[in-house]
C-alpha cells in the first residue's frame, strides 16, 4: 500500500471508527514488510472482538482477516478450518480466519472500511449462530 492509499484509508477509518479502536502497524520505513491493521469491533450485544487484517498484498489482493482468538461454534467446535456454510477459511496464528470477500467481488478500489463493515456483519451473524444454531450461510447465502 503506497503512502497516498494509506492516508486515504486512515482518513476514512478515522471518520467512521473511533480513533482509539484501530491502529496500523509496519506501514512506514523498513517495517513495511508485514503491514497490518488491528481494529476493534463491538457487536450489538456489546461483545468486543479484535480483528487483525494482513495488509501485505493490499489493495491488489483480498486482505486476510482474523478474529484474534479461536472462535467456537454453537456446539463448542473450533472454527479453525475452511467452512462454506460458516464463511471461514483455514486458520493461522491460532485465530479464526473469516471470509469477507470472494475473489470475483474483489477490486483494488475496495476500502478497508468496507472490509471492516463486512467483518462486523460476519460477527453479528456469528453471534446469531450462537443463539440459534443456524450457520452463517442461513443469514447470508453465497453469491
Spans of model-derived segments:
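UBC/E2-like fold recognition across ubiquitin and ubiquitin-like conjugation systems
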Residues: 1-52, 58-143
Amino acid at each position: 500500500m503506497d503512502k497516498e492509499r494509506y492516508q486515504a484509508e486512515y482518513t476514512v477509518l478515522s471518520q467512521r471508527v473511533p480513533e482509539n479502536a484501530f491502529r496500523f502497524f509496519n506501514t512506514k520505513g523498513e517495517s513495511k514488510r508485514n503491514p497490518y491493521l488491528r481494529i476493534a469491533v463491538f457487536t450489538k450485544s456489546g461483545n468486543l472482538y479484535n480483528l487483525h487484517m494482513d495488509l501485505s498484498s493490499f489493495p491488489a489482493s483480498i486482505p486476510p482477516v482474523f478474529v484474534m482468538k479461536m472462535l467456537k461454534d454453537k456446539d463448542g467446535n473450533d472454527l479453525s478450518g475452511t467452512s462454506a456454510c460458516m464463511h471461514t477459511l483455514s486458520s493461522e496464528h491460532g485465530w479464526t480466519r473469516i471470509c469477507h470477500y470472494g475473489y470475483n467481488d474483489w477490486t483494488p478500489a475496495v476500502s478497508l472500511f468496507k472490509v471492516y463493515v463486512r467483518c462486523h456483519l460476519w460477527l453479528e451473524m456469528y453471534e446469531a449462530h450462537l443463539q440459534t444454531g443456524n450457520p452463517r450461510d442461513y443469514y447470508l447465502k453465497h453469491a
